Amino acid sequence: MRKTQPKKIPLAPDPKFNDKLVTRFVNNLMWAGKKSGAYIIFYDALDKVAKITGENGYEVWKKALGNITPGVEVRSRRIGGATFQIPAEVRTDRKISLSIKWMVKYSRDRNGRSMSDKLANEIVAASKGEGAAFKKKEDTHRMAEANKAFAHFRI
């Protein structure tokens, strides 16, 4: 294990909403260092979300992220020659990272014309408690529930 914690790189808030969470999302959305392109995709997606739902796209996106944020996950631990899946609470920072990664991943896997279309559809689905990213969260929680018997083991 490493001796010291790595330094956290300070994030600049995004230009439109002045939110660091948006910057984190855009950094995960970005391909090949093209950050301005990622911002364009993200803002287009929020505009499309606003058009679809009739609500503020930014608020719908925040709600969607909240809906796919996991509370518990399973971690592998080897005990006496057997590997157990032990349920553990997810750290706050990791919760956010996982929800962002899942939303971006399952948006890319969707069918659609452009990435902004796919992202908009995934945001709308997640805000309603549907979609692949929400299903991933549910599966993670279900896995933790199924392995509740091993919760007394330390990780």
Give residue ranges: language-model regions.
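Strongly charged
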Residues: 1-32, 36-39, 43-155
